[in-house]
């Protein structure tokens, strides 16, 4: 089923496709929240991981089964330093995200902030990798 991505000024379907299968399984309501965050941030955001099919190697090896990326309601944004701190504050203040993961150690090219909007019992939550 084809989805209409024309509502997103700063993002395209290609940025969010599964890097393993090429599938598009993003929830457009979630992408709208990321677009709202991007607009508030006022600068480009690089999506390092969006949708992951259940067969994606990262999802397939999870003991509890596929996670938030497989639901189409999560993404990782490659960002570090002051920009990461600014984005983190905006994401927290927005109230749109119930899961926020922060990876800011090591090589800058591998640093990111994870965002999701799952609505299970253990939310809201924030964690570090």
Per-region residue spans from a language model:
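Catalytic cores and adjacent binding grooves of peptidoglycan-active enzymes
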Residues: 65-66, 70-75, 79-129
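Solvent-exposed, flexible loop/coil residues
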Residues: 9-12, 55, 60, 64, ...
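Extended, low-complexity, intrinsically disordered C-terminal regulatory tails
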Residues: 32-62
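Generic alpha-helical scaffold signal
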Residues: 24-31, 50, 71, 81
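A short linear-motif detector with a strong N-terminal bias
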Residues: 25-27, 54-58, 79-80, 91-94
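Extracytoplasmic cell-surface/polysaccharide-interacting catalytic and binding patches
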Residues: 1-40, 108, 114, 118-129
């Amino acid at each position: 089923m084809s989805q209409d991505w024309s509502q997103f000024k700063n993002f395209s379907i290609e940025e969010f496709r599964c890097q393993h299968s090429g599938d598009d399984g993003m929830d457009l309501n979630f992408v709208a929240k990321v677009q709202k965050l991007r607009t508030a941030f006022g600068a480009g955001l690089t999506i390092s991981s969006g949708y992951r099919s259940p067969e994606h190697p990262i999802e397939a090896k999870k003991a509890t089964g596929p996670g938030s990326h497989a639901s189409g309601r999560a993404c990782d944004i490659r960002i570090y330093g002051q920009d990461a701190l600014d984005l983190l504050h905006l994401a927290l203040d927005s109230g749109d995200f119930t899961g926020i993961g922060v990876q800011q150690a090591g090589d800058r090219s591998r640093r990111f902030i994870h965002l999701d909007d799952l609505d299970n019992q253990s939310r809201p939550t924030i964690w570090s990798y």
